[in-house]
């Protein structure tokens, strides 16, 4: 275990005397050892959270997180930063609500400001069918003990007056009849979440190894016993009692190297941001019918997200067809943004399974564990993904929250078809 500097206003002011030149690195960039009790492949939010909770909650000290690039450089740094727990089925609701509750205390626990902004997640309804579906959705959330509030058109207008409600002379193409809001939902800074977990895990003795690509697995009598790696141009091998995969869209590729075929398809999910403007959005606003959603960053950029590109891909870039669809929806719903310029556009590779629910826990290959299948919901699930995978690594059994999300459900048929409540893309 390594000591870390306590972040506080007092220390911030004290460090100002030296021009902030005396801060220690947030985490140690380690060299890999020959053997670990647990190796976690993937240095994004889920991998780092798993390492942190495995060390903190279960006392496992000899852990490595192996990242092919840099910490948080994959999907964790490519999402639209939304956190919410507005899911329909009880199994999903319990899982994501636990994650949101962990988020609510994460800045204090990690001693790192994740910039959580619980501004509310507003979902729009454009038809009577939408209103009926959202009434069912919100009622299910309340039955599961999660906050949800149905809104009429007047209440939506009070929350987001810049939405296009139309008028007698020019009715809106997509009329807004109402919607519902989860007021505890909102956004968090993605880089801060990754860095906070990395810093806290490193302080507990976890080795964080960047630029270390896992190229294969070693096995003995059918059991995974380690990983083959390429670290800064050097080829090597690391032994491990247990290996966990937390690599999002690359899960099926790596699992195949261990002889495991996963029901996972990878797609590009793109997003974009505009130039910064004064505050124009008060909430995270979603329109499932239009396949688009919007929020505003602390810097004033309008963050725009949309649907998947439904051609399987591992390319971290989008395409003009999806961009055109999302931007057309944006101009229709928020016409005041129509003359803004885009600053940048990007894509992450998401791992989608048939029932739009994750896979967490042990696999048929002894010694190999999974955290994948989150699809477009990976960022909001970082704390609970790490919490439940750490439990599985420490005990060999699935956490009670993760029991419905085992790989075997695709054999038993006990699927959790969350597509109706998973937001926009799936």
Annotated model-derived regions:
Residues 80-162, 329-331:
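Dinucleotide-binding Rossmann-like beta1-alpha1 core, especially the glycine-rich loop
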Residues 52-56, 81-83, 112-120, 218-224, ...:
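Active-site substrate-recognition segment that forms the wall
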Residues 175, 179-242:
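Helical element adjacent to the flavin cofactor pocket in flavoenzyme catalytic cores
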Residues 1-38, 53-61, 423:
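Extreme N-terminal leader/targeting segments of oxidoreductases
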Residues 94-97, 124-133, 180-200, 209, ...:
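Short beta-strand to alpha-helix junction loop
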Residues 55-76:
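Glycine-rich FAD pyrophosphate-binding loop
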Residues 331-426:
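C-terminal catalytic lobe of FAD-dependent flavoproteins
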Residues 33-35, 114-123, 160-204, 307-311, ...:
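Helix-loop-beta segment of a Rossmann-like dinucleotide-binding subdomain
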